[in-house]
Amino acid sequence: MGKGVRVLNSSEGVKGTIFFTQEGNGTTTVTGTVSGLKPGLHGFHVHALGDTTNGCMSTGPHFNPEGKTHGAPEDANRHAGDLGNITVGDDGTATFTITDSQIPLDGPNSIVGRAVVVHAEPDDLGKGGHELSLTTGNAGGRVACGIIGLQG
């Protein structure tokens, strides 16, 4: 079993802890709590780079080892890092569990050392018709991020 963890912090007061767990070669389960967000849906993605030297902007595009267009987590044609949206309650907190088969913690497409990013707006899942729908889900700015590391 592999385990990863990421603690999120941002200059905008967003903070949280996200855990990644993979059983054998199976799917990865992502569980977390993030607070300090406006209520509603927020895009949630694994980005290609584990670089936060220029804040969340340094994390690069969505993790996309197969060169596909942006989509929903259940779509066959999607970036590996497309994890959809997290739902934030009226108290500004999101508590979530996501299970996904395209974000392993080991092997050539491992997400360890990459970044997880929470966006300012909802991800349209590639179906919004906006010029950014098929690249970013038109999810707006990056409000919090952190590098995914191994956990003992």
Swiss-Prot record:
Supply the enzyme class, top level: oxidoreductase
Domain of life (superkingdom): Eukaryota
Q: Which Gene3D superfamilies match?
A: Superoxide dismutase, copper/zinc binding domain
Q: What cofactor does this protein call for? A: Cu cation; Zn(2+)
* Keywords, ordered alphabetically: Antioxidant, Copper, Cytoplasm, Disulfide bond, Metal-binding, Oxidoreductase, Zinc
| Residues that hold Cu cation according to the record | 45, 47, 62, 119
Any note on cofactor binding? Binds 1 copper ion per subunit. Binds 1 zinc ion per subunit.
User: What does the entry list under GO cellular component?
Assistant: cytoplasm
Q: Please list the reactions this protein catalyses.
A: 2 superoxide + 2 H(+) = H2O2 + O2
> Which cysteines bridge via disulfide bonds?
56-145
Grouped into one coarse class, the protein's main location is: cytoplasm
Let me know which tissues express this protein, per UniProt.
Ubiquitous.
The subcellular location is: Cytoplasm
Keyword hit for Disulfide bond: yes
> Pfam families attached here?
Sod_Cu
Cite the EC number: 1.15.1.1
Q: Return the InterPro entries for the record.
A: SOD-like_Cu/Zn_dom_sf, SOD_Cu/Zn_/chaperone, SOD_Cu/Zn_BS, SOD_Cu_Zn_dom
* GO molecular function annotation: copper ion binding; superoxide dismutase activity
The residues that the entry says bind Zn(2+) are: 62, 70, 79, 82
Briefly state the protein's biological role.
Destroys radicals which are normally produced within the cells and which are toxic to biological systems.
Family membership noted in the UniProt record: Belongs to the Cu-Zn superoxide dismutase family.
Q: How does it assemble?
A: Homodimer.
Q: What is this protein called?
A: Superoxide dismutase [Cu-Zn] 1
